[in-house]
Regions:
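Short hydrophobic/aromatic beta-strand or adjacent loop that forms the aromatic wall/cage
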Residues: 25, 122-125
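A generic local structural motif
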Residues: 12-14, 40-41, 113
Length: 132
């Protein structure tokens, strides 16, 4: 992951945003909820209008990923999508929009369906809305 993040940043997304046969990736900056340390996670994303949608799957693990908890504590952050750095505010998708956003996410990466079958928790979707 560190190598992916470093290459993505160094090339302004030329390396790391898209790989042949794989879904597009963004870099999510987040601040540790307990530690306060800045972290970066490369994640698959889907688009929903101007918003970006990320999936807290952790490969179907029983617990949510650390970045999810970090965003709940510190929702104002930045993502890098290709060469663009975008300030965003994170929020958990509402029940009313979840099914529609889940289908968008699965269109980008079908493995999310299998991840959901591996775990008893409902995998959260996080909407990243651009801040103005």
């Amino acid at each position: 992951m560190k190598g992916h993040t470093a290459a993505y940043r160094a090339t302004r997304g030329v390396v790391g945003h898209r790989f042949p046969g794989l879904p597009q990736m963004l870099l999510l900056d987040h601040v540790g909820a307990k530690s306060g340390r800045r972290r970066t996670s490369p994640l698959v994303y889907a688009r929903d209008g101007h918003d970006l949608v990320i999936v807290a799957s952790k490969g179907g693990h029983p617990r949510n990923p650390a970045w999810f908890h970090n965003l709940r504590a510190n929702p104002d952050t930045t993502v890098q999508v290709g060469s663009k750095r975008i300030p965003v505010r994170a929020r958990v998708a509402t029940p009313a929009e979840r099914d529609r956003l889940w289908e968008k996410a699965v269109e980008v990466y079908g493995g999310y369906r299998e991840y959901q079958l591996r775990t008893e928790r409902e995998i959260p979707l996080v909407v990243l809305a651009p801040r103005r």
